[in-house]
């Protein structure tokens, strides 16, 4: 009798687990594909690349100036008085600090590049995420995975990939 009720209990538990797992609906989306298909996103990326190159050139120029000052100092150190040595060393350190501060200003965690990226990309990303959410709610998906960023996905059926539907909802044809 105990074995029979034990089996029945196990059957009920497994039935519940499998029935609730079967009710889950999943979808995949390829965010890289979506963003590459949106011209505004590509333009924003290009704009960020251009400004990044410009700012990096400014930082590089200051670093080259510091290196030049140092090389000149090394070549002339034997001819300099203590005061001249100190003045040159201070100039070199000052130039290096100026380059480091400029680099931090442009490329630091809260730097100009971060601010510009946020200003350009956030509206586009929010629009895409809103479209994904609307499609998920409409179709009853409990989970939408990004196949571009989740390396845990080994295989995903194209039938559950909603990337093209997201692009269509945003007004872009694929």
Regions found by a protein language model. Give the residues of each.
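Bacterial N-terminal signal peptides
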Residues: 8-19
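Positively charged n-region of N-terminal signal peptides that target proteins for export
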Residues: 1-8
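Amphipathic alpha-helical segments
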Residues: 24-139, 143-151, 173-174
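Short, exposed beta-strand-loop hairpins at the edges of beta-sheets
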Residues: 154-155
């Amino acid at each position: 009798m105990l074995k029979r009720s034990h089996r029945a209990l196990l059957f009920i538990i497994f039935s519940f687990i499998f029935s609730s797992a079967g009710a889950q609906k999943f979808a995949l989306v390829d965010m890289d594909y979506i963003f590459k298909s949106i011209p505004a996103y590509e333009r924003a990326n290009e704009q960020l690349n251009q400004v990044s190159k410009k700012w990096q050139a400014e930082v590089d120029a200051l670093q080259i100036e510091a290196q030049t000052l140092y090389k000149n100092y090394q070549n002339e150190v034997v001819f300099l008085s203590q005061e001249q040595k100190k003045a040159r060393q201070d100039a070199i350190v000052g130039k290096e600090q100026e380059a480091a501060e400029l680099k931090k200003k442009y490329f630091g965690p809260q730097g100009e590049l971060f601010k510009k990226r946020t200003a350009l990309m956030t509206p586009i990303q929010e629009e895409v995420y809103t479209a994904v959410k609307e499609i998920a709610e409409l179709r009853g998906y409990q989970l939408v995975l990004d196949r571009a960023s989740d390396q845990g996905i080994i295989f995903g059926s194209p039938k559950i990939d909603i990337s093209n539907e997201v692009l269509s909802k945003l007004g872009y044809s694929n």
